[in-house]
């Protein structure tokens, strides 16, 4: 079929299999260009492995360190009539090219919040991966979580706390500057957001893996977070999501103490703002990212997901000098350090009040934002003919859970 982009709200409802594959190949090439090291992780589990930072960590582990990888995600496969999700095509491409490079790659498609997923992962590690993993990457970003204990469904809320938040934002459908107002979260919404996006599920994963004896001596775990800046704090760090991320920090401290007993450790890695399906859903983020991308590109500081993960692995988790990673006062790995530089943030604060519908494209990198957003779904690549026929029914070595 011939597939063109169709955007609705902050979601692109179509995806291009070949474009997604080429995106993955770009990330593999960027990783290989930095050389392969053999002093890092050997067996890696990535929970939330199909897009954004999770996919980038899987690519970095495999193609930067030669690791065997097991990826868990929840995606829709394509059929001969309908395209699947971008994450499905990303994972198919990863699997194909990892196997072609002689690397072990296995994938599980199902609800990563479920006990069934944990049981399947443990079984695979025992029967297929030599019995133990030495790195667990936790990278789930989901608006809903079904609690394994009760079957109850909880939803997260992208809302401020206390007061209605009003700020300049972009209506990404109309490319206009608007005033967006968001009502504050209720106590229940805050609690539910912590349940969905906090550290509870990460801890359940480590509990299950540890009890089953599939964590190697010295195993590490890392979960991803975002703190952002004063500009985004009301909706993010000081909002319901921020409360969930604080819970993630507390969880990391508990897990770190536990894994340190066998020479390992756990950390939250705070990453920079990037264009992902997750960030596109957060009001104010498209405008902030459009500004910060322009400023960081001008300063030669720009990084995408793969550059961030490369730096996390090579300069933090697995330093060549064997030294422990530099952490902040909360024991977090900070990869948002360049974005938070005073010169970058001062430029953002100065630019923010000047942006109007008329000068949006001139003052910010909104054109770059739109391009990156469509690229997430496999579009806007110069090396893909979007008027050519493409088969949406892509199959690969993937275990489907109920």
Curated annotation (Swiss-Prot):
Taxonomic superkingdom: Bacteria
Catalyzed reactions: a 2,3-saturated acyl-[ACP] + NAD(+) = a (2E)-enoyl-[ACP] + NADH + H(+)
Protein name: Enoyl-[acyl-carrier-protein] reductase [NADH]
A single BP term in Gene Ontology: fatty acid biosynthetic process
Site features described as Plays an important role in discriminating NADH against NADPH, chain residue numbers: 75
Pathway assigned to this chain's UniProt record: Lipid metabolism; fatty acid biosynthesis
Binding positions (NAD(+)): 48-53, 74-75, 111-112, 140-141, 245, 274-276
EC number(s) stated in the UniProt entry for this protein: 1.3.1.9
Family statement: Belongs to the TER reductase family.
Stored Pfam families: Eno-Rase_FAD_bd, Eno-Rase_NADH_b, Enoyl_reductase
Classification of source organism: Bacteria, Pseudomonadati, Pseudomonadota, Gammaproteobacteria, Lysobacterales
Enzyme class: oxidoreductase
Binding, substrate: 226
Catalytic residues of the enzyme: 236 (proton donor)
Chain's gene name: fabV
Quaternary assembly: Monomer.
Source species: Xanthomonas campestris pv. campestris (strain ATCC 33913 / DSM 3586 / NCPPB 528 / LMG 568 / P 25)
Gene3D superfamilies listed in its UniProt record: NAD(P)-binding Rossmann-like Domain
Physiological role: Involved in the final reduction of the elongation cycle of fatty acid synthesis (FAS II). Catalyzes the reduction of a carbon-carbon double bond in an enoyl moiety that is covalently linked to an acyl carrier protein (ACP).
Record keywords: Fatty acid biosynthesis, Fatty acid metabolism, Lipid biosynthesis, Lipid metabolism, NAD, Oxidoreductase
One of the record's GO molecular function terms: NAD binding
């Amino acid at each position: 079929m011939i597939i063109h982009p169709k955007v609705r709200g902050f979601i692109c409802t179509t995806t291009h299999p070949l474009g997604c594959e080429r995106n993955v190949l770009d990330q593999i090439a960027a990783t290989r260009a930095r050389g392969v090291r053999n002093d890092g992780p050997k067996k890696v589990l990535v929970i939330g492995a199909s897009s954004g930072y999770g996919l980038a960590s899987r690519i970095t582990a495999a193609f930067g360190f030669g690791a065997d990888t097991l990826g868990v995600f929840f995606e829709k496969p394509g059929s001969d009539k309908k395209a699947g999700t971008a994450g499905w095509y990303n994972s198919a491409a990863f699997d194909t090219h990892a196997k072609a490079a002689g690397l072990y790659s296995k994938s599980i498609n199902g609800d990563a919040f479920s006990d069934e997923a944990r049981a399947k992962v443990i079984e695979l590690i025992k029967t297929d991966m030599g019995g133990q993993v030495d790195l667990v990457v936790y990278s789930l970003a989901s608006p809903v979580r079904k609690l394994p204990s009760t079957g109850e469904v909880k939803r997260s809320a992208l809302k401020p706390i206390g007061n209605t938040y009003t700020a300049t934002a972009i209506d990404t459908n109309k490319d206009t500057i608007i005033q967006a107002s968001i009502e504050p979260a209720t106590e229940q919404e805050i609690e539910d957001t912590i349940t969905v996006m906090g550290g509870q599920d990460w801890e359940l994963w480590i509990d299950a893996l540890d009890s089953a004896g599939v964590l190697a001596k010295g195993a590490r775990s890392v979960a991803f977070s975002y703190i952002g800046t004063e500009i985004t704090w009301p909706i993010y760090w000081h909002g319901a999501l921020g409360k969930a991320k604080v819970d993630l920090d507390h969880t990391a401290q508990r897990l770190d103490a536990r894994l340190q007993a066998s020479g390992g450790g756990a950390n939250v890695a705070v990453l920079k703002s990037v264009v992902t399906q997750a960030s596109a859903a957060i009001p104010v983020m498209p405008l902030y990212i459009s500004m910060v991308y322009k400023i960081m590109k001008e300063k030669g500081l720009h990084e995408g997901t793969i550059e961030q993960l490369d730096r996390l692995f090579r300069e933090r988790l697995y330093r060549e000098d064997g030294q422990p990673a530099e952490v902040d006062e909360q024991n977090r790995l900070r990869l948002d350090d360049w974005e938070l530089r005073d010169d970058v943030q001062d430029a953002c604060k100065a630019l923010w009040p000047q942006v109007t519908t008329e000068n949006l494209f001139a003052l910010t990198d909104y054109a770059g934002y739109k391009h990156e957003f469509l690229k997430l779904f496999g579009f806007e690549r110069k090396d893909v003919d979007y008027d050519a026929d493409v088969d949406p029914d892509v199959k690969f070595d993937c275990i489907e859970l109920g």
